[in-house]
Amino acid sequence: DLALFGYAVPAIRAEFGLTLSEVMAIVSAAFLLGGALLVVLGWLADRVGRLPLFQFSLLGSSFLVALISIAPGVITLTALRGASIAVGGLSYPVTGAIITEEMPARLRGLFMGLLQIGYPLGWALASLWSMWLLTEYGWRQLFWVGLVSLPMVWVVRRYLREPPRSVAARSTEPPPRFSDLFA
């Protein structure tokens, strides 16, 4: 969705009558909001488990990205963008943690490499789809692409399990306090 938003900026500017400075402020505010929310979500992943938060990330980011398409104004657009950055961004560290905790050492590098390729591959696919979708349907319909990842929630629920190391850590150690982040 990072690529989608970037490609949609000219059309968003035109629809809402925004200056370039206002667009930069929206993008900055969305990333700041997303970063702050991501800290809280990362803390929650250690508290409730990686797998539930990974599923939440897939489900939540799919819907949040799609909801951008119906944003009635700039404030809603910024809030949805920030929330989608945080919720979607959560999948990356959680997936990395699951891979390092679950994969045998001989496969860990391969799977981390496969995880790393997702970002540039997603950006490339978004670039290709965006050209066509923006031209044919406009910026709002572009964000419905976020729903494409919904079937992954079923795959995760069906085939992944909470890493035993994560379960063991939660059962032997008291849950981390939010203030521990700043200690």
Question: What residue spans do the PLM features occupy?
Answer:
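Conserved MFS/SLC helix-loop-helix module at the cytosolic interface between two early adjacent transmembrane helices
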Residues: 36-74
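Helix-loop-helix hairpin linking two adjacent transmembrane segments in secondary transporters
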Residues: 115-158
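Flexible cytoplasmic inter-helical loops of multi-pass small-molecule transporters
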Residues: 158-179
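Small-residue-rich segments within alpha-helical transmembrane domains of MFS-like 12-TM solute carriers
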Residues: 2-3, 69, 85-93, 124
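Cytoplasmic helix-loop-helix junction between adjacent transmembrane helices
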Residues: 79-117
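Extracellular/periplasmic helix-loop-helix junction of adjacent transmembrane segments
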Residues: 6-38
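MFS 12-TM fold signature
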Residues: 34, 58-65, 84, 149-153
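Helix-loop junctions at membrane interfaces in 12-TM secondary transporters
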Residues: 69-80, 135-138
